[in-house]
Every structure is written in structure tokens, then in C-alpha cells.
Amino acid sequence: TKPEFDFVFRIKKERYLVMSYLNNQLGYRDALLDTRSIIKKGDYIVLDPDGLVKNVVPGYENCDVTILGSSAMGATFADYLVHVHEGGKNTGIGGEGIESFLYVVDGELSVKNDDQSAELTKGGYIYSPASNNITFEAKGEATLYVYRRRYEPVAGHSAHTVVGNANDLEWMSYEGMENCYVQDFLPSAHDIGFDMNMHILKFHIGASHGYIETHVQQHGMYFLSGKSMYRLGDDWVPLQKGDYC
């Protein structure tokens, strides 16, 4: 187990293909079927990668797409885990009132929107405002986290395209705690043109949140490494690399 963990922070209904494809656990098993996944619609969900399925989502070509959070689960956003094969691409994510965000978990690919284009490597990301969509194309294999949400505007303010890489960002102590750190990807803390944020939190052994967050905002979290116990609603839930909640 690594001594720390990180996580980041959106179709047609019955269209899915292969189950449990992420860990190659296909066919019959020797034990009774079980899962760590928890579905409490309107409260929280935990998705164990062992049970994730491939979905058919328009616009993705030569990609394995798994829907994570969605309105069907009670979320105000939708996010996806995307495994891109050689030559895989998307013809347009977001736009027409939908803001979008793409993060490269592994691999590299070319991305662009109406404002700019970039070559993203592991840790790279692009945020695209609701007026633009993101397209991407990969020359090799890549794993992506993709997020979509209907933008909530504030009069006189607007969001803009942001491109960067987590490896170029400074780790900041999280709320003054020296064993917990954060990297913010978007300037939402001081620019109300951005109606949401994306960040990575890093917890060393023994670190935790300073309090149990109680608020109206929703989170989507994908765990990049490590293991932890996380308080969700009234429950303490074990979470680890590859989990989503």
C-alpha cells in the first residue's frame, strides 16, 4: 500500500457491453459473487472497479467508456472513465451550455477546443467553458477522467479555457494541515465566472479532513492511489485506488 492517496474531482440507458473489464475478471469465478459498491441514490454511491461496465456513448470512437456519476444516481453532473485505444478519439465533449473537463490519468493525447489546442501527457488537463466543446485524439493507449455539467452563469462573469498539468502545480497545505495537500486546477476560489472546481487531494498516513463537510455542493471523486476510510453520509466506507464515489 502506498503511504498516501490522491483523488480528483460527468447515453443511452440500457446500452452496455462487457462487465468487469478493468481487471480482466471475465467469465465464471470460483467464489460467490460479491461487490464493495454501494448505491444510495440522493445520498452517495461507491463504485468498485470490479463491477464497472463498458457503455456505448455517442461521440467516442475506439474507446472503452464507463459512466460513473449521473443524474440517474442523483448527481447534477456526469463523469466518465475512458480508456482510449490507439487512434481513439471524441468528436465533441460539452458545449451548448455544458462545461467540460478532461484529465489524463495515464498516457497522452491531443486535445483542442475553439480557443486552443494542446498535447496532454499524464497529469494534463483541459477545462472548456460551456460555449466550447473539447475534441481529442490519441496516437497510443490512454486513460482519461471526463466531466460534464450544465454551467450556471453569474451576470457579468464568465469562465475561460484552462490548460495545465498537475506535475507543474505546487502542492499547498490543505487548510493549514501539514500532512494533507491540495492542487487546485481552476481559479474558482477568486473568479466567480467558474461555478465549480477540480483538484487533487493528497493525504499522508494519519492525515484526514479537519471536519465532516456538510454542504449543498456535490463531489465526484476518483481515487488515484492508496487506501483510506472515508465518511459518507452516516457510514465509514473503505476506499482504494480505482474506486469512484
Predicted features, each with a name:
Residues 53-92, 173-212, 217:
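A short glycine-rich, His/Asp/Glu-containing loop-to-beta-strand
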Residues 21-72:
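An N-terminus-focused feature that recognizes amino-terminal "leader" regions
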Residues 1-23:
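N-terminal amphipathic/basic-hydrophobic helices that include classical n-h-c signal peptides
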Residues 89-122, 214-243:
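A short beta-strand-loop-beta hairpin characteristic of the jelly-roll/cupin
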Residues 63, 75, 116-117, 130-155:
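Ligand-binding loop in jelly-roll beta-barrel domains
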Residues 85-89, 122-125, 129-131, 204-206, ...:
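Tight coil/turn sites that cap or link beta-strands
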Residues 21-26, 139-181:
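Double-stranded beta-helix
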Residues 84-86, 104, 128, 138, ...:
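Hydrophobic residues in beta-strands and at strand termini
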